[in-house]
Amino acid sequence: MAKRIFLFILTNLLVITTIGIVLTIITSVTGVGSYIQNGRIDLMALLVFSLVVGFVGSFISLGMSRWMAKTMMGVRVLNPKKQSLSYEEQQLVDRVHRLSRAAGMTKMPEVGIYHSPEVNAFATGPSKRRSLVAVSSGLLQQMDDAAVEGVLAHEVAHITNGDMVTMTLLQGIVNTFVVFLSRIAAWVASRFVKEDLAPVVHFIAMIVFQIIFSILGSLVVFAYSRHREFHADRGGADLAGKDKMIHALRTLKSYTGHVNEEDQTAVQTLKINGKKHSSLFSTHPDLDERIRRLEAK
């Protein structure tokens, strides 16, 4: 569980930490924009600093999302204009594009396959016009056509719902609180040591508290991730039909054990299939609950 949490928050944490350290060094050297003056903390200056670091960090992560997913998951993008595709690959591209057009998209998402025995798929990208839908080789091997259709419709719904942008805004708010609170906590900690040790203690405490608050903040992100899955299920049902969407979820349930727990879970929130049992740290709600809600639709 600790590894899953760590991998999920790693990219975002590294970005905001790097930006925060760079800005802290700049303000320390130049004195411009410093939120600590004469040993006292300027809360308004710190809030502005936190907003800049928090939202810049989250939008950098958003901009990198498609490239990062391709790199970390080893996604092979299928482009009929530049390469010869097999019948199965061409059929996958055609299905994604057909569902995308049905959803009102004018710019078709990239379509890719990543090699993994897990039965899974994900969608990502900074915008509807720069999106990616990728499926695992295990999904194509194990699922029938109706189930694949339901999964792809679910992923297209994520794109048209703008889930990545909404997630970025939420992450920006979480980041702001993480940066703000971690620096206040670090400042308080530095007050309990000798003056010559205060800068070192402040820096170390800032990093430690930032990690702790990031883990706590991830609970909010995970909760939203679970919430958005229900919306994507409904959107998938509208595109592919309720029966296909329910069939896809039931098929996923039978292959839940094939989810790769050692995979690069920094993209775990993007996937359709999560762990079998839901918890506070789950990115996906329980599959039985997802099926129940669709059946009641």
UniProtKB/Swiss-Prot annotation:
Keyword list, A-Z: Cell membrane, Hydrolase, Membrane, Metal-binding, Metalloprotease, Protease, Transmembrane, Transmembrane helix, Zinc
Keyword Transmembrane helix among record annotations: yes
Active site: 155
Cofactor note (record): Binds 1 zinc ion per subunit.
Topological type in the membrane: Multi-pass membrane protein
Enzyme Commission numbers on file: 3.4.24.-
Chief place where the protein resides: membrane
Pfam families assigned to the protein according to its UniProt record, in alphabetical order: Peptidase_M48
The name this protein goes by in its record: Protease HtpX homolog
Organism whose genome encodes this protein: Bacillus velezensis (strain DSM 23117 / BGSC 10A6 / LMG 26770 / FZB42)
Gene transcribed to yield this protein: htpX
